[in-house]
């Protein structure tokens, strides 16, 4: 039995749509269908047929048959789409390409361009369900597992073609399959004719040719392996079909602009007749990863839409066209530039959903966007700052939420935004033909070119939905009272116009400015970080291998392997009956190239790790975080609790034998101490027996913690800051600044500059990489204890107001008021609250309070900040590692002289439960869910948030007002200074070096009096400012 090699790859499909209308095309497709058959490709090879199975008659004519149960809709477009999909079922076509009727080459017909001919003539393919064929015909049958799916495709003959290619090779020769030949191909159940097949995947199947032998009553069966092309895209879901049908209803409302002449006509209307309207704008952009890349300098606008309206209704651009859709793909740059007068006119009011993104991508094309009127994302956050469900703040989520849209005008289109995933997404198909879970979407350029009408509707709906959303949110905010620091001030839409509208424009301006980054410096500290990480990892492995030999080869980034070393035998929190094993085997990379003699070196090897701690009771897991699967998390606090508070420099000074390195790298034996101070060490000290072994364990585990810390700095800051995806050609990074926190604080992403490591943890001085351009300087200005000052103002706390008025070390004063023995020491002048050295003085005459009573001051400091965050005695006990009773007693000491704060906290909790919202200084609100049926955990969370939100939110209000004050300052503009970044309570500006001193004084003045040149708070706003070439030096 001969087995032929796989079939050659099939040529790309071609499809020619029928132009014009024909009576016979409008008839029902229940019995007969018609389609155009493209001409053959050059070189004599015939093109693919829209077939799922073939039959060849004695006359050489093909006929297409459909399964009796196939759902056939009487729609031309439906049939055309189905025909397209059938083109991709290529296996049977490969068979058909190689079938001849006896020794006669295959004949295939082309559809004539004259549809007036009788449809029964041989020039038109007919489509019908072939149940049976005579024995004289050569049939191609496709099996669906055991059932024969009678999907047959046959064509009428019109023009002869060259002999087809052989199955075995590309030679032009007939296969000479005679009458009665039969070919069978197994097929998968889930692969339907209706599948959409823009791509195909391959799987191997068996082709069986049952060949009749002339003049004999026997057949010769030939079996060969062939490649079966299986679709990798499933059919549209019912949801997608319904959404498409609804979406198509807006097409008649859209005016398509795709040339310069029509663009000029539209722009003339926009800038004259409809200039006073509100214009909602939206862009569609290709060549950008919105999750990773900044839109500044990235992305390509392929189309945009504009939808205009006012209180009287929609703009009309002729023939009922109310929305403009502009095609700028494939050479449409000139069309886009015609809209520059519209976009750049500051008097034309424009509304956006995510103004930042759209404005940047338009400005990439050389158009400076002006006339910002509203960002519906900001309006939605002002209305409800705590949306987490129902799509959050996406355009789809907002416009399909009746609670948001119930204030919209009735005459505006009612269709809410529909996601691209719903309209264009299709599930992939697995290799076995079954439907997968992953949904993929074609590139937007392809969608715009090939699904043009649907794409026009989809992208136009964005601007239509944006205007509708703006109208509804504006109505809602106008109905909500604005309370400014306890006094009525107007409506919340008035607040938006006065503060958040200019603030939104300022944030976009700051994003455009960006900040210069020294990549050469980042590259150098990356090398240092990699070396130090290796040293720390090797230190830990060396120590661990003393207790477990295979730990020498372990992956220090594997939580499971670390858990195995320290926590074998712990119980699963989700499944109490399940425990982590005492020993376990792991696969690790074979970096040492270990191999069995005579065999190849494997890429991986197996190691065995076992638990190295005997007394697990010393490792308390109570109150520790667990993974989703119920196992103890082994990062962060858990490992540091084992190591203790060991300075990081000790990790590189103490080796595994308890020795300290000299300057030259040699080591000397540490002297034994009569009384060892064990306070810096964690629970691992006792667990490993104390003394030398205990110290070794703590230092080794601290080294492991350093591995994680260094990894975080490398992956989170050092490497990303060097990427092109967040920077432009000038070397400046452009992060995205967003008002998207529940309290109103800014967040920054791509990159997340808000999460820069604290100075004491910034071991590689990452801020040193943020520098001013040549000839410029950075000013870094920071509020001092802003949230505590806000708390003092909101609560009118006499003790705190007096402490801030007196000045000095606030936390030392708090400790003095909390602890009588500290107060006695201050009054007896044994310690000083603070000390300001005079010329010639090197040290204070007596110790400072922060040095003599460090523990008390640390507790006071933590309490000062914890109270503002609503932390309870339970939380404090965990922070201090003490009993809850002790933490509660300390908390009472703090509240003893601050009764106003206790009363204010009760009031905030009551507001959260009664009105389901609390308010900031400027009157913004944070909403909470109804607590009537909430559990204890949820109630506790809301109580803490009710205390924290007004404080943090008011601090955000102050920072915003300060930035607006700086932006409005004419002198700073004249000197050439501009805002670059805001990180929490800190702002950064850049400008000419020669005017740095004057500019710094102006910035301090603006920040200390941020409310139009005044300070409405009961306490002064302390501002510390410096200028230098880098962010680090100016801190």
Swiss-Prot record:
Residues 111-120 have a biased composition (Basic and acidic residues). It catalyses: DNA(n) + a 2'-deoxyribonucleoside 5'-triphosphate = DNA(n+1) + diphosphate. Its EC number is 2.7.7.7. It is an enzyme of class 2 (transferase). Residues 100-124 are annotated as: Disordered. Residues 317-478 form the 3'-5' exonuclease domain. This is DNA polymerase I B, mitochondrial. It comes from Oryza sativa subsp. japonica (Rice).
